[in-house]
Amino acid sequence: MSTKDFNLDLVSVSKKDSGASPRITSISLCTPGCKTGALMGCNMKTATCNCSIHVSK
């Protein structure tokens, strides 16, 4: 079987690129009204509880 049989869009990374930062970072700034934090979202009573997720390129 050849390695060209399947194209999975994999990218090879060299060791010199090991200092790269993650592309997705998240910051949770929820108030006590958010029962379960950023994973479950905000409580209905506190729709603006300042939950946020930052995605960088």
Swiss-Prot record:
Cross-link (Lanthionine (Ser-Cys)): 26-30
Keyword Aminoacyl-tRNA synthetase: no
Task of the protein: Lanthionine-containing peptide antibiotic (lantibiotic) active on Gram-positive bacteria. The bactericidal activity of lantibiotics is based on depolarization of energized bacterial cytoplasmic membranes, initiated by the formation of aqueous transmembrane pores.
Homology family: Belongs to the type A lantibiotic family.
GO biological process: defense response to bacterium; killing of cells of another organism
InterPro entries hit by this protein: Lantibiotic_typ-A_Bacillales
A molecular-function term among this protein's GO annotations: signaling receptor binding
Protein name: Lantibiotic nisin-Z
Signal peptide: none
Modified residues (2,3-didehydrobutyrine): 25
Effect the entry attributes to changing residue 50 to H: In strain: JCM 7638
One cellular component (GO) term of this entry: extracellular region
Covalent cross-link Beta-methyllanthionine (Thr-Cys) as placed by the record, residue numbers: 31-34, 36-42, 46-49, 48-51
Residue ranges listed under propeptide: 1-23
One Pfam family here: Gallidermin
Annotated positions of the 2,3-didehydroalanine (Ser) modification: 28, 56
Assigned keywords, A-Z: Antibiotic, Antimicrobial, Bacteriocin, Lantibiotic, Thioether bond
Post-translational changes noted in the entry: Maturation of lantibiotics involves the enzymatic conversion of Thr, and Ser into dehydrated AA and the formation of thioether bonds with cysteine. This is followed by membrane translocation and cleavage of the modified precursor. The structure of the 2,3-didehydrobutyrine is not discussed in PubMed:15361862. It is probably the Z-isomer by similarity.
Nucleotide-binding found in the keyword field: no
